[in-house]
Amino acid sequence: MRKHLGFTLIELMVVVAIIGILAAVALPAYQDYTKRAKLSELILAASSCRTGITEVLQSATGELPKAGNWGCESATPTSKYVAKIETDDSGAIRVQAANTKDTDIDGHWVSLIPRGTTDAAPVLGEAVFKWVCGNPKPVIGSEFVTDIPSKFLPGSCRG
């Protein structure tokens, strides 16, 4: 009787099937992770704008700047995945995604909207209590929305 060395055909087929199942489960999760990583760049781009708007809202004594005049907007790409940054009259920010090679993301927007203590747009001289990020529907004081599916947004930006 000969001693068997190596794997039999059945054992190899089982191993290949297991690897295939693991790949089928892991690949979509990895793809979602890379999309979230790319979108975190949009949140980072809005962060400097958010700081400036918060300072203006808390310290200004005159009239609030109008849409596009908060000093942090950009009509041209500012980084690899950021196409442009816009603001509205209430200080809400929206950032457009680009170059992610995904139709669910490219050309779509992520919004950050300042909220006062009453969950409405903050008034001049009032502290910004929180920033609402990733809102799929308009909130009081701003028409900006996030139209990127929430599963692709970073955890800190899911409404």
Regions found by a protein language model. Give the residues of each.
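N-terminal single-pass transmembrane signal-anchor helix
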Residues: 1-41, 45, 49
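Conserved hydrophobic/amphipathic alpha-helical signal-anchor segments
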Residues: 32-73
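Periplasmic/extracellular, small/polar-rich flexible segments of pilin-like filament-forming proteins
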Residues: 58-159
